[in-house]
C-alpha cells in the first residue's frame, strides 16, 4: 500500500458489545490455519461482543480450505459474493456460483476451493449450535439467492426479503436473509430486539441507525448489531441497497 497520501482517517466505528461499522479500507489480513492462497479478514468475533464469527475472504487461484469448523457444537454458513467454488460436506460436492450458499450443521466439516483462474469472494460464518430437546439437528442446506423470489417486507414494495434457510423448522437456531431496498426505501420503524446481526453490504449506499446514531454505509461495509441496539436503514443514491445478514431465532433465552 505504501506511504499514505493524506491524513490518516477511518469511517469505521467500534462500540464493543453494542455495534460496529467496519469499512473495507481498514481491514487487515489474518493468518487463519486451514486457508491456502486466500486473504482472510475476521470481521466479528466474541472479542467484539458477537456470539458468532464472520469472515470476508478473497480466494485466489488455487485457494482452498480443506476443513472449516466441524466441531460437534459448531455450525457454519458460506455465501459466494463473486466467483465460483466447489464445496464439500459429508462427502457430497456442490458447485456454488455467485449467490450460492451452503449451511452445515454442527459436527459437519466444510471444505471449499476456488474454481476460477481469478479471485472468488466469500462471506463465511460460524457459531455454536444450541440444540432443542426432542428436535433433531438440521440437515445440510444449499441453494442460490438468484433462485429465491423476493417477498415484499411488511406489505412495502420498496423493501424486499429473501430467506436463505427454512423459517418453519425449529431445528434451526439461526437464519440468513437478504434485505433489498429501492432508493429511498427504509425499514417501517426503528427496531429494538434481542437478536443480534452480522450484516455485509452487497450493493448500494444508505444511512443506518445504530443505537440512535445515523451512520453512512455503502457496499462492502460490515455491520455488527448487538442485542437491543436500535437499528433501521434508509437507502440513498440511485442504486438498490442490499445486504446479507444473520439472525438468531427459535430459542428461548437462557437464565
Each predicted region: which residue ranges?
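Short, conserved beta-strand element in jelly-roll/cupin
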Residues: 56-60, 70-87, 178-182, 192-208
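Short histidine-centered beta-strand/loop micro-motifs
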Residues: 65-72, 113-115, 187-193, 234-236
